[in-house]
């Protein structure tokens, strides 16, 4: 066999091996933790005992209840304390580390309760307050039917200073003011809409103190599109007292509507994106997870953090389908997006009902 023939054969064999390597991906080695669970990075093993502890002792056995709602709120109130011009460390845990300062900010009214609930877990486990806040929020959302696995990165350093005041948007702020504040932190108008999917599993305690634990939609224990549907219905009543700052009329007894949500659902800058979330569970899940991950990294250097996203549990499947509440029809929708028709939805059977408060509020 000539040298030229041998060379051609070697090249052919090399190409075949290269093709085979490309066709059969290498199996990624996973770390086995002390309790037998596995993760992509051994540094993430420290999270499994924390996961078990908060599921049992903070979230009442992995429920999607009041503590989940408040933990998710805390992720935002800590992280949005960030401005390139005004300062703030972002998602650094300052709202826990400097709680005597930040919980007294007017926009953080009522958040002292979840801060007090989380502080013992931070003290007990080897984790920074910034990491714990974002980890607890991600785990909490995963408890909700229809929820998402929000990416989680470990390794935030301890906060060195309190956030400045006036960085958290208020429910009585104008749309332009809210969008300007969020733009300052790096978020576009559509990303603001995506973040507000959090209100699908949220409630208000302080907007109307006479009715604590009043949810923003009729399914506060399910991560779904009902919030985006029901905020577009005509307001009929105040579920408690009237004339509360930051409150608009709600369509249902037992459901509260923030003035900011009412306006964002109808503003030309956000109305079409708002409507696009109706009955679009994959979009809600994908956009919310991506934007929450972005928010959780405000003020942080991602290259210095460890991706521990695989520790976050897989959420239960969505329960139920998008619908109009009983007693409503499409004529009750105050459609603000002229570009596309409002999705065709049917109403639940029966008369108009009342939404119960979130248990444990």
Swiss-Prot record:
Summarize where heme b binds, as residue positions.
199, 203-207
Instruction: Specify the protein name.
Output: Versatile peroxidase VPL1
Primary site of residence:
secreted
> Which Pfam families does the record match to this protein?
peroxidase, Peroxidase_ext
Annotated residues for binding of Mn(2+): 66, 70, 205
Extract the signal peptide range.
1-22
Under the heading SUPFAM superfamilies, the entry gives:
Heme-dependent peroxidases (SSF48113)
Cite the InterPro entries for this sequence. Answer: Ccp1-like, Haem_peroxidase, Haem_peroxidase_sf, Ligninase, Ligninase_C, Peroxidases_AS, Peroxidases_heam-ligand_BS
The cofactors it requires, by name, are:
heme b; Ca(2+)
- Positions contributing to Ca(2+) 2 binding: 200, 217, 219, 222, 224
What is its subcellular localisation? Secreted
| Source domain of life | Eukaryota
Binding positions (Ca(2+) 1): 78, 90, 92, 94
What is the top EC class of this enzyme, as a single word? oxidoreductase
Q: Where is this site: Transition state stabilizer?
A: 73
Q: Which GO terms describe its cellular component?
A: extracellular region
GO annotation (BP), single: cellular response to oxidative stress
- Write down the chemical reaction(s) this protein catalyses: 1-(4-hydroxy-3-methoxyphenyl)-2-(2-methoxyphenoxy)propane-1,3-diol + H2O2 = guaiacol + vanillin + glycolaldehyde + H2O; 2 Mn(2+) + H2O2 + 2 H(+) = 2 Mn(3+) + 2 H2O
Source species: Pleurotus eryngii
Q: List the disulfide bonds.
A: 33-45, 44-308, 64-144, 272-337
Give the gene name: vpl1
**What UniProt keywords apply to this chain's record, in alphabetical order?**
Calcium, Disulfide bond, Glycoprotein, Heme, Hydrogen peroxide, Iron, Lignin degradation, Manganese, Metal-binding, Organic radical, Oxidoreductase, Peroxidase, Secreted, Signal, Zymogen
What does the record give as the function of this protein?
A versatile ligninolytic peroxidase that combines the substrate specificity characteristics of the two other ligninolytic peroxidases, manganese peroxidase and lignin peroxidase.
Positions annotated as propeptide? 23-30
Q: What is its EC number?
A: 1.11.1.16
Q: So what family is this one in?
A: Belongs to the peroxidase family. Ligninase subfamily.
């Amino acid at each position: 066999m000539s040298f030229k023939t041998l060379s051609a054969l070697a090249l052919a064999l090399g190409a075949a091996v290269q093709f085979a390597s490309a066709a059969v991906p290498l199996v990624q080695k996973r770390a086995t933790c002390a309790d037998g669970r596995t993760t992509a990075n051994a540094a993430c093993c420290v999270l499994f005992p924390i996961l078990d502890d908060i599921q049992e002792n903070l979230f009442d056995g992995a429920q999607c209840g009041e503590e989940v709602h408040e933990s998710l709120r805390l992720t935002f109130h800590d992280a949005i304390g960030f401005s390139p011009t005004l300062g703030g460390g972002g998602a650094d845990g300052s709202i826990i580390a400097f709680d005597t300062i930040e919980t007294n900010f007017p926009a953080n009214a009522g958040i002292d309760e979840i801060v007090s609930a989380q502080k013992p877990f931070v003290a007990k486990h080897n984790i920074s307050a910034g990491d714990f806040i974002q980890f607890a929020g991600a785990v909490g959302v995963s408890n909700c039917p229809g929820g998402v696995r929000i990416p989680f990165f470990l390794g935030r350093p301890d906060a060195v200073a309190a956030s400045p005041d006036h960085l958290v948007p208020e429910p009585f702020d104008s749309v332009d003011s809210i969008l300007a504040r969020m733009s300052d932190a790096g978020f576009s108008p559509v990303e603001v809409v995506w973040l507000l999917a959090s209100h699908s599993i949220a409630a208000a305690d302080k907007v109307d103190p006479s009715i604590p634990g009043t949810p923003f939609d009729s399914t506060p224990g399910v991560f779904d599109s009902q919030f985006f549907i029901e905020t577009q219905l005509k307001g009929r009543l105040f579920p408690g007292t009237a004339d509360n700052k930051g409150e608009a009329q709600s369509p249902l007894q037992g459901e509260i509507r923030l003035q900011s949500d009412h306006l964002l659902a109808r503003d030309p800058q956000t109305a079409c994106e708002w409507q696009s979330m109706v009955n679009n569970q994959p979009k809600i899940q994908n956009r919310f997870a991506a934007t929450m991950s972005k928010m959780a990294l405000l003020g942080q250097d991602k290259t210095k953090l460890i991706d521990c996203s695989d520790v976050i549990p897989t959420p239960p499947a969505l329960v139920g389908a998008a619908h109009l509440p009983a007693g409503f029809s499409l004529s009750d929708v105050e459609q603000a997006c002229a570009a596309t028709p409002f999705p065709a939805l049917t109403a639940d059977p029966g008369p108009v009902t009342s939404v119960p408060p979130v248990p444990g509020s």
